[in-house]
Amino acid sequence: MNQLYQRSFLRLMDFSMNEIMYILRLSHFLKQQKSNHTETQKLHKKNIVLIFENHSTRTRCAFEVAAFDQGARVTCLTPNISQIGHKESIKDTAKILGRMYHGIQYRGYNQDTINIFAQYSNVPVWNGLTEQFHPTQMLADLMTMQEQVPHKSFCKIKLAYVGDARNNIGNSLLEAASIIGFDLRLVSPREFWPQQELLTTCRKLTKLNKVNILLTENIQEGVKDVDFLYTDVWVSMGENEKVWTHRISLLSPYQVNQDMINYTGNSNVKFLHCLPALHNNETTIGKKIAHKHNLFNGLEVTNEIFESKHSIVFDQAENRLHTIKALMISTLLPNLYHKNITFHTKN
């Protein structure tokens, strides 16, 4: 029996450690099947709708290709072609889409919006990103960690996230570590630490699961001996540029560069980033920030590190496809995908 059938995935805490590990096992299996051209379509005649309130490259492509690989049909709704939240309420939209589609992906701003979709659609809803959480990214991150250090269980893995730890990646990593059990260091100015409510919830889990989570402003302490260094962008489009200036001034010491790599003491440390990354001035926004703040070798990460042997960001991005495929299969099929991939607690 598939215990994830008809379940929504709005944040990582919606699933147990056992359930997340099942999705990861299925992800590895599906990746191998795709590579071997032996994949079996299990989502034939399923209809999936992808809702985007903001721009997307990796999330949209991963959901679309995953659905197509599995034989599902996809509709994509963007703000310029839908009435969601403008002429039609979220609640009403959820009710009608739930009658037409087997699953809904939502990528937008407010976590409350996706919660309404899940409450009223009566079909699985998957969080492609909100300002609060990015759980589908976490599945790809966990899979990538397993691939890079296959000799280590999660409880032996150390990861440092540096920069803005209050964003959706920082929040989701906090949940991931609390559930899965890897050693997490959030290395950030105190102003950018996660909200106290989330910290309190996760600390209860860490005590239960005997997990080590460190919040520190001290870079050398935070990154010492880690297996993975992770960061995310510091600025977002649409924000006031005064906000950018304030953030950059506080976060500039937390740039992932060669000095930080050296501080880890691990010559094989791997670099993670959910992308897009401002690692050079080849983009419009990168060029603007470089000239205004005199940062010509990247913002949150230098181009040297982004292009180095340490960087596994494109493996990480590819794994969005395999984990999203596993998530859709797990929540849309009443039975297990393969008899040899079952629910158990080993990590």
Curated annotation (Swiss-Prot):
This is Ornithine carbamoyltransferase. Reversibly catalyzes the transfer of the carbamoyl group from carbamoyl phosphate (CP) to the N(epsilon) atom of ornithine (ORN) to produce L-citrulline. Belongs to the aspartate/ornithine carbamoyltransferase superfamily. OTCase family. InterPro entries: Asp/Orn_carbamoyltranf_P-bd, Asp/Orn_carbamoylTrfase, Asp/Orn_carbamoylTrfase_sf, Asp_carbamoyltransf_Asp/Orn-bd, Orn/put_carbamltrans, OTCase_ArgI. Its main location: cytoplasm. SUPFAM superfamilies: Aspartate/ornithine carbamoyltransferase. It comes from Blochmanniella floridana. It comes from the Bacteria. It holds the Pfam family OTCace_N.
